[in-house]
């Protein structure tokens, strides 16, 4: 049995995916596909089509602890309007620029310096107006917006911090 205590409370309206552990040989797409190994961020492939709740993903992680070491959440309409503001560098500058808004959001931190994810919910009447923004489109400022994809939110080196109520 594994220790799945690293999984935070995740709303049941969010769809999730177990994440392959770093170094795990990934399933082949077809017979002629070359071997590929996980970098620790690769979601369980069938999760893109299946609707896995946090309980489903936790059970998979518990049953195969050497294969899956993290949990991700899908963003966009399939997770009730969840959007992730993903900061890979320049966290201090970004928090200074948008600190007031970021302080209100749940925050996923990691041991990587200057990196965090901030989680927001888009109102239902605005979900058709949201799109992902890549690092390139963001002017290489160190952030991107995840919408319609997935983001890893909990592994042994990350944790989710909920904002304090003012």
Q: Language-model segments: what does each one mean?
A:
Residues 1-160:
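Conserved phosphate/metal-binding and DNA-contacting active-site motifs used
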Residues 161-166:
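A short, hydrophobic C-terminal helix/tail in secreted or cell-surface proteins
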């Amino acid at each position: 049995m594994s220790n799945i205590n690293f999984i935070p409370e995740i709303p049941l309206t969010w769809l999730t995916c177990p994440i392959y552990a770093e170094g795990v040989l990934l399933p082949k797409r077809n017979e002629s596909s070359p071997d590929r190994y996980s970098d620790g961020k690769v979601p369980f492939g069938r999760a893109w089509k299946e609707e896995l709740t946090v309980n489903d993903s936790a059970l998979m992680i518990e049953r195969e602890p050497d294969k899956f070491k993290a949990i991700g959440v899908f963003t966009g309409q399939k997770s009730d309007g969840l959007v992730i503001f993903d900061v890979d560098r320049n966290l201090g500058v970004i928090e200074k620029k948008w600190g007031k808004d970021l302080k209100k959001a749940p925050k996923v931190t990691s041991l990587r310096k200057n990196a965090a994810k901030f989680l927001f919910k888009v109102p239902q009447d605005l979900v058709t107006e949201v799109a992902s923004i890549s690092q390139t489109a963001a002017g290489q400022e160190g952030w991107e917006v995840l919408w319609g994809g997935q983001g890893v939110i909990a592994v042994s080196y990350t944790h989710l911090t909920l904002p304090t109520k003012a």
